[in-house]
Design a protein with these regions (language model features):
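Catalytic PLP-binding core of fold-type I/II PLP enzymes
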Residues: 80-112
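PLP-dependent aminotransferase-class I/II
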Residues: 28-73, 80-87
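General beta-strand structural signal in soluble alpha/beta enzymes
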Residues: 10-11, 70, 78, 99-103, ...
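Active-site-proximal loop->helix
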Residues: 19-29
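Conserved PLP-anchoring active-site segment centered on the Schiff-base-forming lysine
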Residues: 2-18
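Active-site C-terminal subdomain of aminotransferase-like
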Residues: 37-38, 64-65, 69-71, 79, ...
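Conserved C-terminal alpha-helix-loop-beta "cap" of PLP-dependent enzymes
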Residues: 4-7, 197-248
Length: 248
């Protein structure tokens, strides 16, 4: 999708910026991080960055923004509203930027209580998105959906060149055929959300505080270091990030 001198705008907390081992940079494209609020970026931020780049007379010395990356839910479990998503999409179309939505946990975003974003909304707003399989019951894989006709041509060449074309690719596709029969994909996602809310309520009763107020199954509990060490005596555990000098 991108030419060698083009980069990807995303939230500074975005998955490709913090938890992908530099994968985007490894393919030759710089991640252009924007300050996030509760894991999200806005259409206004994207427009301001775009305008700043194209008003720079020496812009050919700088990586050109060409794609916007967001995830739903975000890396911290928050959700975009329909209005926020449409606003980002509008800005991207006006500026000639591609909008990519990371849907690894999309099922949980769609089934979270209070959300007004639907799968058709995502398809309408994004140039490319993918439907997460691994985190919603599949053995492996994600389903890439390209809605922009200009990006569809030769995409299979890219898949093959990057080592993503499986000899037994039918095994990947059949999982999604089953997941989308009789609403199973959404049933699995809703069950996970329901269980996460039970866990959240129980932890709140125990006095634990949360990094974000998330309605998804991404629940980040703030834990004292001493308690974390105590847990480690019995279980394998990692933390997302340091919260302060004595908490994770």
């Amino acid at each position: 999708i991108l030419r060698p001198f083009q980069g990807v705008l995303c939230a500074d907390s975005g998955h490709i910026n913090v938890h992908e081992t530099g994968a985007v940079e490894a393919t030759g494209h710089k991640v252009l991080a924007l300050p996030s609020k509760e894991g999200k970026i806005t259409g206004q931020q994207i427009k301001e960055y775009y305008d700043l780049h194209w008003s720079d007379e020496s812009r050919e010395h700088i990586v050109q923004p060409k794609m916007v990356y967001i995830s739903h839910p975000t890396e911290v479990g928050t959700l975009y509203t329909k209005n926020e998503l449409e606003n980002i999409s509008t800005v991207c179309k006006e500026c000639g930027l591609y909008l990519f939505l990371d849907g690894a946990r999309m099922g949980y975003g769609l089934m979270a209580p209070g959300t007004d974003v639907t799968l058709p909304d995502i398809a309408k707003c994004c140039d490319v998105f993918y439907i997460g399989g691994t985190k919603v019951g599949a053995l492996f894989g994600e389903a890439v959906v390209i809605t922009n006709p200009c990006l569809k041509q030769d995409f299979r060449y890219c898949i093959k060149q990057k080592g993503g074309m499986l000899a037994k690719g039918r095994l990947l596709g059949v999982q999604f055929l089953e997941l989308f029969k009789n609403g199973l994909y959404f049933e699995i996602s809703k069950h996970a959300i329901d269980m996460a809310m039970l866990l959240k309520d129980g932890l709140k009763e125990k006095g634990y505080e949360f990094f974000m107020d998330s309605n998804t199954n991404q629940q980040f509990i703030i834990v004292e270091d001493a308690k974390l060490q105590e847990i480690r005596q019995k279980y394998g555990v990692t933390y997302q990030e340091r919260y302060d000098e004595t908490h994770s």
